[in-house]
């Protein structure tokens, strides 16, 4: 059952999703539609899966949903690296930094939940 107390990973992923929306809109304004759409899907999915995990039916379900969030984070990192290494894409250093923090927190939660 969901706990309505402050939750670091929920807060981090919500903030990240809002920043991904802004960056995707910036990409679209630069006519980078395909990457914008991919980033929007994977980047907002991280938080959606974290939220789903808060309502998990079991410990195994909780871990499974967080693993899905971690996979989405990995995909998002791929798209951000593509933007970073491609010519004519706006900078996104803050997003990469935010995402690395999220990946670390997810990894710690997953590993500690398995114990």
How would you describe each model-predicted region?
Residues 1-52, 56-115:
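Short, C-terminally biased terminal segments at protein or domain edges
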